[in-house]
Amino acid sequence: RSLVGSEMCIRDSYDPRVSFLATVDEKKIAALMCLEITDGMDLHSYNGPVVERTAYKAGLIKAGTSYRLITHLEQKALRIAAMTQRETGCAISIHTENGTMGPQILDILAAAGADLEKTVLCHVQRDPNLVYYKKLLDRGAVLCIEEANKPHLRSDQALAEILKQLVDAGYKQQLLLGMDGGRQEALAAYMAPEGIANGLSYLFADFAPMLLQQGISASALEMMLVHNPARVFSMEVS
């Protein structure tokens, strides 16, 4: 069992007049990001005025893009993510808004020297397009297929069918499974005062058995749940 802390510049939600993402040189920000991985995460999330390193080191670089758009600041964040990865070997996780802009994200990261085999594109299941997925996977990227137990978005059955098609097409080594469950309603312990709720364990207790029933082999499921995360998130630590 493990928890991986991430450091992030996610989407264009930073004030272009005063935020450090907007006003500080890319190389200087990348140096700060590297220190979060090698030395420890800042207690104040670099909000200043001082930096106090904690004992906890980041193990994931995160950036994000907008819906059908990558703003100038988001492009800068992607380049910084690539620079940080080059120095540390840490994986990059990209928030895509409704799965859009995947090819353009990979273009920017590749041009900045990122390792696309350690680059995870998240939320792509929002755009259920097998041709689109294959275009991203054929460039070496990793896709995180998420949002089981969210019937207001799509049924679990539809999500399972997407995964079965990708596994059958030979991409099982480039797939991760997740819940996108950072909000309160996705956490059983937080919802306990209200009653019984499905938590993050739904992925293993309910969705994984459905994948087996769908015809995905136990070895392919283990690949997506165990071996792929171990490979993608591995890095040399001092």
Residue ranges and their predicted role:
Residues 121-127, 146-165:
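Active-site glycine- and acidic-residue-rich loops that bind
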